[in-house]
Amino acid sequence: MSRLLALLALAPLLAGAAETTAPKPPSAFTVEAQRRVEAELPFADRADFERADRGLIRRPERLLIRNPDGSVAWQLGGYDFLLDGKPRDSINPSLQRQALLNLKYGLFEVAEGIYQVRGFDLANITFIRGDSGWIVVDTLTTPATARAAYELVSRELGERPIRTVIYSHAHADHFGGVRGLVEPQQVASGAVQIIAPAGFMEAAIKENVLAGNAMMRRATYQYGTQLPKGPQGQVDMAIGKGLARGPLSLLAPTRLIEGEGEDLVLDGVPFTFQNTPGTESPAEMNIWLPRQKALLMAENVVGTLHNLYTLRGAEVRDALGWSKYINQALHRFGRQAEVMFAVHNWPRWGNAEIVEVLEKQRDLYGYLHDQTLHLANQGVTIGQVHNRLRLPPSLDQEWYDRGYHGSVSHNARAVLNRYLGYYDGNPATLDPLSPEDSAGRYVEYMGGAERLLEQARASYARGEYRWVVEVVNRLVFAEPDNRAARELQADALEQLGYQAENAGWRNSYLSAAYELRHGVPRDQPTMKAGSADALAAMDTGLLFDYLGVRLDAGAAEGKALSINLRLPDIGENYLLELKNSHLNNLRGVQSEDAGQTVSIDRADLNRLLLKEVSAVRLVFEGKLKSSGNPLLLGQLFGMLGDFDFWFDIVTPAAKSEG
């Protein structure tokens, strides 16, 4: 049997020899792995499909949403292949189930006066009926999708103005569409209020700025943005179908929920807000609606194990704190709740079920925290813990605890990293060579490229795909132009992608295979680390911190300058000092020894940094005033580098020339 599997496993390699860039079919080992999943999980439980359809008011026959410039912001037609329910051997059956559930889009009634539009973006948008208008919780990613959701609600439920916008937390898929619902003038006049958890603006901006370019490039892997939709491509994103495309917007909150939370009455509707900082977002809050006995758990309890560490990159989240906040919600609200819903996936009804889900999600994050550290305290390292830790059956067999978004594997490593860091304690790993420097030596020790490939192909034929990608990665980094190595690496990554239950893992594996076969798509549009709204909302100190990240240390070597910067429209002064190839900024300080003093409104500084206007034009218009050496600010800006979005990931990074 094992020999037959090996021969069948080699068939995709041989069949694909004529067209090496095309996706390969699932191997016999992958098919066998999918059958094991079907046997191990409770697929007879179809209750989630009833939940995901419950309360449906309207499901548009064709969902295609365009941005104002005519580009496609969102469409679901590419996922029609899922609708026949036929098992696909190139998709993990558990992930395929989640992918089909996330296709349940449209306008739904959750409870009396509470409605959700689901499937118009990665997240859900919630409309709560007030005395005179709508209270909206979360605004999707981009104005086009938010506007389309609001138009659907208006058609089906009647036209009503929006009185309040609530941001549940500080991630872009929950605030980026706000300008599709309300105008800045409505907020400025007080006609619309915006409510958010304490720390919202700092969290919304800071998390995505300083390392924003790297995060967004890595997000192309996690979300599979380069992949075609299909059985051998992108099928889902666990908490939704994928990312909407279009500009982000951001309007600052007019009221923050402070402390542990607050009780408010909004347009006649009573709300209780529970702040949960440091859970799924640095600033996040659950919402209790006592009139309907409805509990909105933000993104703290959704239809999957969530990320303690997200593959795009971010600070590691606090598993223990997350567990404790769920426990608080359970005891404050959960034992009264008759409906529980969230900003992703579908609701749940009935108190007994709600209590059980809250308990098991609480214990899911608590178990990951405690048992990871239990192993760590026995000497298990960050390179081992993901192969040791397993969930108990009472958690593992619940669909909402499965690892579609987070995974036990990468979450366990995240917990260990949060407490002990990346170093495993073994001095052999304390000061490693860079992969591109060690790769050639590994290949030499293994007998050269041909011998390595010969053995790797044999491992591939045995279905040892994890081992193949570990070994062949060395050869790809030693010889990035070795076509045979790239093809074998892509084939092995692809099989891992087909087998992955986790949507981010699948997308990452398949994106890596795509780039190994086709190269990095440098001609594709790039994602921006910040929009004009984001820049305007950014604290000035953070703005200058970001300029420090952009500083080209080589260009700044040996240079020293100091600039007094005055921002009269916001009443702030900063001292900028460049020394030792580092840019310092200090608020509220001016130096008599500064080489230049510049006065410019913060709004005009934003325009200058966005390259909407030149410094010469601002001087001519009297909007930039300077004394001392007039060249220093220009010299400083001339040392700022721009980041290449499409940097290499699965091959050695190109050497910088500067």
Swiss-Prot record:
Binding positions for Zn(2+) 1 per the UniProt entry: 169, 171, 280, 299
EC assignment: 3.1.6.21
Keyword Metal-binding annotated: yes
Record's cofactor remark: Binds 2 Zn(2+) ions per subunit.
CDD domains in UniProt: arylsulfatase_Sdsa1-like_MBL-fold (cd07710)
Keywords associated with the record: Hydrolase, Metal-binding, Periplasm, Signal, Virulence, Zinc
Reaction(s) this enzyme catalyzes, per UniProt: a primary linear alkyl sulfate ester + H2O = a primary alcohol + sulfate + H(+)
GO molecular function: identical protein binding; linear primary-alkylsulfatase activity; metal ion binding; protein dimerization activity
Transmembrane segments: none
Signal peptide annotation: 1-17
Subcellular location(s) per record: Periplasm
Entry binding sites for sulfate: 307-312, 317, 405
Protein family membership: Belongs to the metallo-beta-lactamase superfamily. Type III sulfatase family.
Biological role stated in the UniProt entry: Alkylsulfatase that cleaves both short and medium-length alkylsulfates, including the widely used detergent sodium dodecyl sulfate (SDS). Acts in vitro on primary alkylsulfates such as decyl sulfate, octyl sulfate and hexyl sulfate, but not on sulfated sugars and arylsulfates. The hydrolysis of SDS allows the bacterium to use SDS as a sole carbon or sulfur source. In addition, contributes to the in vivo virulence of P.aeruginosa by playing a central role in the degradation of mucin, a glycoprotein that is the primary component of the mucus overlaying the host epithelial tissues.
Protein name: Linear primary-alkylsulfatase
